[in-house]
Amino acid sequence: MYIHNLDPVLLDFGLIVIRWYSLAYIFGIVIGWWFGKKIIIHILKNTNFKFKLDDFDDFISYLIISIIVGGRIGYVIFYNFNYYILNPLEIIKVWEGGMSFHGALIGIVIGTYLFSKKKSISMFFILDIIACVAPIGIFLGRIANFINSELIGKVTSASWGVIFPLVDTLPRHPSQLYEAMLEGVTLFLILNILIFKRKYKVGSSSYLFLIYYGFFRILSEIFREPDAQIGYVFSFFSMGTILSFFMILSGFVISGILKKNEI
């Protein structure tokens, strides 16, 4: 049994406060950008695909905006709509927390579509790169969730249960760490082994990401408490489970479309 005593704040300089959660976003994007370029170089070296590395650098600004705007709007719509419709000014207070992975994903797809149209390049190629590096940010984000004592797991009698004093005195599944290992480490290994060891096909990493992430998230939701302001939908499904189901469905649909059109 472990009693959680980690401080969400890394450094406090008074007016300037550095939090682990903020660093997770920053390092996730920076490391993802660096590794994404490695993947692009590998693909360009082993295929006839044409793409400018500078375009990926330009895309990062679109990515950052897409993650923040999409993640925030997704949280507002999916998880706390009634509150924010009555308190619209609270929506802009991103620093107080409240981001949705599924909302960020939708934002990334929209941002990538707009960027690809502007540059006249393949949207699915960029999404493939994002799919391969996204688990890095997901891993860091879930570790930050654990440090923050948020997205807590269900009560357990297992020896590895964690007590979060900021929540209550009950031992709980460290569901954040389960997600870090499944949606972060495992998903990263699957997608990158495939893209480095097999012949690259545009769009393949994108739909595999949707399918595998959706599956891992649904599995993790079994051990995770539902969001307090929503609870269970239809007395059984968490919002994360429902949204992840549609991710899996979208993954299979995209797979079928790409194979049909031989993209």
Each model region followed by its residue ranges:
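A feature for loop-to-transmembrane-helix boundaries and adjacent hydrophobic helices
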Residues: 1-263
